[in-house]
Each structure stands twice: as C-alpha cells, then as structure tokens.
C-alpha cells in the first residue's frame, strides 16, 4: 500500500484539528506540529491504525521547527512514501482593533507564526525532499495575514 505523508501545523484545535481528523485514513502517515498535543487525536489515530506523531513546538520559533523538520525528513526513507504534503495552517490572530491601538508585540507574534514559520518550514521541506521522486505539495492557509 502506498503511504502518503502529511505534515500539518496547528493541528491541536480548530480547523487544523478538523483537517487532522480527516487525514486519519488508511494509507496516510500524519506528523502534526502544534503548541500542544491533542490526546483525542492520538486516540483516534490509534483506533484508525494510522501512524501519528505530534510534535509540541511553538511556531513563534520557526527556525527551530524548520531545523527539526529538515533533520527529520532527511532521516526518512523516501521509498516509504508515495507523496508528501506540508500544510502550513498554524496562525495567531492578534486582537482585532484599529492598527493605531495595536501592540507591536502582538503584530510581531502574528507575523512570526503566520509568515516566518511557514516560509522557514516550506524552505526546509522543499530542501530536504528535493531529490524525492514522488509528488510534493505545500499548502499555506492563513486566517488573518
């Protein structure tokens, strides 16, 4: 059976959790990167017999997450997968208010999680899988940038 690898950020709740639950299908392997692991998702993966790894990592540190992803991908055997997809879904929405009332720290956090981390993760993903012979995809989802 061909295994499809999905790497999904922001999978511990909301739309990311809903996507992760839908990806718990036979033939898929799922790596989730979120601030918190989700015990219900782990249980659902176990029941579905779908390989699931949950990394707890705050994507405000996109560089650290991208280095870990690159190293992990380089340690994988490409022959184990029929396709590989990175879904950048994590995001932080700062308090909604006029820009003049916004705090610089809130705006910076939103940019780190919603822009810097997806760019760094995408670069790591594309670089580490460059020689992989199967289809590779990157999907970026944004809630507020």
Question: For each of these PLM feature ranges, what is it?
Answer:
Residues 103-119, 139:
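Catalytic Tyr-X3-Lys loop
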Residues 82-85, 93-108:
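Conserved mid-core segment of classical short-chain dehydrogenase/reductases
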Residues 91-92, 104, 130-145:
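Catalytic loop of short-chain dehydrogenase/reductase
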Residues 26-42:
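Conserved glycine-rich Rossmann-like NAD(P)H-binding loop of the short-chain dehydrogenase/reductase
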Residues 9, 81-91, 114, 140:
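Rossmann-fold scaffold of SDR-type NAD(P)-dependent oxidoreductases
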Residues 74-78, 113-134:
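Amphipathic alpha-helical dimer-interface segment in Rossmann-like NAD(P)H-dependent oxidoreductases
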Residues 12-13:
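Conserved glycine-rich cofactor-binding loop
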Residues 47-63:
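Rossmann-fold cofactor-recognition segment
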């Amino acid at each position: 059976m061909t295994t499809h690898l999905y790497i999904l950020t922001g999978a511990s709740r909301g739309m990311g959790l809903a996507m992760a639950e839908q990806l718990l299908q036979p033939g898929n392997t799922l790596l989730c990167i979120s601030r918190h692991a989700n015990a219900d998702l782990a249980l659902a993966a176990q029941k579905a017999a779908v390989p699931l790894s949950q990394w707890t990592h705050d994507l405000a540190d996109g560089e650290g997450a991208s280095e870990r992803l690159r190293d992990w991908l380089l340690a994988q055997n490409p022959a184990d997968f029929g396709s590989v997809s990175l879904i950048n879904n994590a995001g932080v929405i700062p308090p909604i208010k006029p820009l003049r009332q916004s705090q610089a720290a809130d705006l910076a956090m939103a940019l780190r999680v919603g822009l810097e981390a997806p760019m760094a993760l995408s670069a790591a993903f594309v670089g580490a899988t460059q020689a992989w012979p199967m289809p590779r995809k990157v999907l970026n989802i944004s809630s507020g940038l």
